């Protein structure tokens, strides 16, 4: 277990809309991640939601009953030891919010694909989310067959067989399938045991220069606050390498758009780290793993309403260049997933508009040149990314962006 209050691993909660991702996250963490007013109204996740939990184990009970997230053993009421703290990234399942799911996938060390037993499998975004995990290199996957309380045993077995058939030949072919009722809390102990066994904590190298993927940014000041009480802007995200500490200077790229005459360019933002936190707990140093809040000296106007989400942050002078165009080696899927007609994917074409996700950023670009092994794309919004980074590629088909593959930055 990590010595600090930090989580050790980020696990994505993905799957089709309304299959129970947010309910399962709440059952494991006690946190309802849909807190945005529009989310509460519509009953779906719109932004990425985050919540932490500690996996604990009873010293005396047998497996899997010995696993819990509570302060005492659910089976015997006895003492429990904390094994690991984990962060869940709850991604939206609605097809119009695929870009948000893709930007969240870059934070994931593993994923739980939630599939409702009460609907035929696969549903469109079940397919699309699994392809996205594959495209972005998320390998450690568990499948939760949720809502088993709503179906007969025969229907649950039929749905299980559909899941096995659907995952054949994918990154999740050998993933354990765990029947669960998030609503009733049934089989959560089995799920916790599987998380411990199948989603390992990645090996982290804290000696590398720090890099933080920014997934959210906020103005934490309440309207009408006195000037003397105002706090600087807050950014939230995941450190992917190295460590940051309170007092460090921080560079955020791409930064601010500056227009001079008829030319525009982007200027990195430099600020200082005032505080680091996980939930309500303060840290002096933050390392990879979990989702971190970083308090800064920035004008809160720069951070409000996720204005800096998609940025990359690190020590000044250590970040990669900001790219206004990128050259990638594309790897396209055979067919479009997530739509009714699974069309064959055509090669990239010159002058076509694509949506690209790299790290936590989403941008749109136009292909300047396109060959089978190399494509050059001019970006509408620049990104800060390294050579070798993976980029998810989506194409507009009908009125929706559809994932068509990924590329490696050359």
Curated annotation (Swiss-Prot):
An example Gene Ontology CC term for this record: cytosol
Region of interest called G2, as start-end residue ranges on this chain: 43-47
Catalytic activity: GTP + H2O = GDP + phosphate + H(+)
Binding site for Zn(2+): 58, 61, 73, 76
Stretches the record annotates as G1: 15-22
InterPro entries registered for this protein in UniProt: eIF2G, eIF2g_C, eIF2g_dom_2, eIF2g_GTP-bd, P-loop_NTPase, Small_GTP-bd, T_Tr_GTP-bd_dom, TIF2_gsu
Region annotation G5: where it falls in the sequence: 181-183
CDD domains assigned to the protein according to its UniProt record, in alphabetical order: eIF2_gamma, eIF2_gamma_II, eIF2_gamma_III
Family, similarity comment: Belongs to the TRAFAC class translation factor GTPase superfamily. Classic translation factor GTPase family. EIF2G subfamily.
Region (G3): 90-93
PANTHER family tied to this protein: EUKARYOTIC TRANSLATION INITIATION FACTOR 2 SUBUNIT 3 FAMILY MEMBER, EUKARYOTIC TRANSLATION INITIATION FACTOR 2 SUBUNIT 3-RELATED
Pfam families, A to Z: eIF2_C (PF09173), GTP_EFTU (PF00009)
Binding site for Mg(2+) 1: 22, 45
Keywords linked to the UniProt accession: GTP-binding, Hydrolase, Initiation factor, Magnesium, Metal-binding, Nucleotide-binding, Protein biosynthesis, Zinc
Cited function: eIF-2 functions in the early steps of protein synthesis by forming a ternary complex with GTP and initiator tRNA.
Major enzyme class: hydrolase
GO molecular function, one term: metal ion binding
Positions bound to Mg(2+) 2: 18, 43
Assembly behavior: Heterotrimer composed of an alpha, a beta and a gamma chain.
Region (G4): 146-149
HAMAP family the UniProt entry points to: eIF_2_gamma (MF_00119)
Organism: Methanococcus maripaludis (strain C6 / ATCC BAA-1332)
Name the UniProt record assigns to this protein: Translation initiation factor 2 subunit gamma
Cofactor(s) in the UniProt record: Mg(2+)
Chain positions recorded as GTP binding sites: 18-23, 146-149, 181-183
EC annotation from Swiss-Prot or TrEMBL: 3.6.5.3
